[in-house]
Amino acid sequence: MGCGSALPTTRHFATSQVVNLREKLFMIDCGEGAQMQLRRSRLKFSRLNHIFISHLHGDHCFGLLGLISTFGLLGRTADLHIHSPRGLEELFAPMLAFFCKTLTYKVFFHEFETKEPMLIYDDRSVTVPKIRPCLRSRRFSRPCQKDGSCRRHIRPSESSVPRN
């Protein structure tokens, strides 16, 4: 959706990635322009039920309010789950109360502490661990092991891996 440019340009949108696992969409970060890129990609909005915000910088979450509002305009009824570091709900609650009073669905914020590793989300399709920030970059978007090697944020659950 977006390559991660903190300053959106005509060629590069702010951070937002979508992972399609078993026809379920999972969004990682929701920068400005995310809903436009979803439309361009012809991905069904109704299949997106979980959004994961890596950290609380504007270029990672400024697209949320517009996306939530658009879901309401489209008559969405399925719950939307937003997983983020602590503080996002406090930031968005007043804006949702003001701009999205008549939503036809519920938005649930699942916040976590950023200091310790933990399991953020797990179902039969995907496991999403929260890891400590990489000491080299001080970012949560670059997870590193104790030996300095980096690993992926989202990995398929064992049950979702096809067996031969």
Language-model segments: residues:
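Binuclear metal-dependent hydrolase catalytic cores
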Residues: 1-164
